[in-house]
């Protein structure tokens, strides 16, 4: 009887292990590779763009980004530098803005982040698995019809198909992430599905970067991409890359639901 009980216990333990592994895999499906075709995309009209911005700025009410802080932080690096020892990923921060002269508040531009897999195995980013030597961008937005909140890979889509209209004069630096730091990024992404005119893409990128990097950045008050860009150049200008390649390795997703975009397919 004891042997039978031990055998049953062993089978139950194995079943739970298998089930747990399967469940973990199910929680992180593989991201779908982006098409690399040469199609011609027509952007929205200036009027529709203005309407989107007005709707986003007046109806989106997301609060602050309350991010977990890593228990250890990495140093800032030049874009393209070799990953630090023990790193599984690189976190890159990007910022750009239009020149608005003496405007008291310049809300133009955009800021976002990317994670590049520098390991020899798949890693999880935002609930999706990405392969070695591939990358995923992400940032919240309030001015796209399908969703207000976190978007993945939209920057790469725009840069591939509408390169002349998006992300000119952009600057970036990077930092290395070990598995523990990447886990912090992912837990913070799970809390990032919102946006408002005040707690915007610049607030998000500042907070996410500072949670894992010892060399902090500021997007100012109010948070703006221009302030973030200026801080990158003031503090780490000798490390910043100008107009780097923006990856488009995977299709566009939005939300914590990881819904594939229909508009940007």
Roles of regions detected by a PLM:
Residues 116, 177-179, 217:
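Extracytoplasmic/cell-surface-exposed regions of Actinobacterial cell-envelope-associated
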Residues 1-11:
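Bacterial N-terminal signal peptides that target proteins for export
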Residues 28, 37-58, 63-67, 184-265:
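Activation targets extended, charge/polar-rich intrinsically disordered C-terminal tails
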Residues 11-19:
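Bacterial N-terminal signal peptides
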Residues 18-36:
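Sec-dependent signal peptide cleavage junction
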Residues 98-103, 167-175, 187-196:
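Second-shell loop/turn segments in exported
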Residues 105-108, 175-182, 194-202:
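Solvent-exposed, acidic/flexible segments
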Residues 62-168:
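Glycine-rich catalytic cores of cysteine/serine-nucleophile enzymes that process amide/ester linkages
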């Amino acid at each position: 009887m004891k042997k039978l009980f031990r055998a049953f216990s062993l089978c139950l333990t194995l079943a739970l292990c298998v089930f747990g592994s399967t469940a973990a895999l199910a929680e992180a499906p593989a991201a779908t590779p982006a098409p690399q075709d040469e199609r011609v995309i027509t952007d929205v009209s200036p009027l529709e763009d203005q309407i989107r911005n007005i709707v986003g700025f007046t109806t989106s009410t997301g609060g602050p980004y309350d991010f977990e802080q890593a228990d250890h932080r990495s140093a800032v690096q030049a874009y393209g530098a070799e990953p630090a020892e023990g790193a599984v990923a690189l976190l890159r921060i990007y910022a750009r803005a239009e020149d608005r002269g003496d405007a008291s508040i310049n809300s133009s531009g955009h800021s976002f982040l990317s994670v590049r897999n520098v390991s020899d195995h798949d890693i999880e980013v935002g609930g999706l698995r990405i392969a070695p030597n591939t990358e995923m961008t992400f940032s919240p937005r309030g001015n796209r019809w399908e969703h207000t909140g976190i978007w993945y890979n939209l920057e790469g889509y725009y840069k591939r198909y509408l390169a002349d209209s998006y992300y000119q004069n952009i600057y970036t630096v990077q930092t290395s992430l070990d598995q523990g730091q990447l886990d912090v990024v992912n837990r913070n992404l799970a809390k990032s599905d919102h946006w408002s005119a005040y707690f915007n893409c610049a607030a998000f990128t500042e907070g996410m970067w500072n949670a894992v990097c010892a060399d902090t950045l500021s997007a100012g008050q109010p948070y703006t991409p221009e302030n973030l860009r200026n801080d990158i150049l003031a503090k780490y200008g000798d490390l910043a890359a100008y107009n780097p390649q923006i990856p488009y390795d995977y299709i566009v997703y939005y939300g914590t639901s990881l819904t594939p975009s229909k508009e940007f397919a």
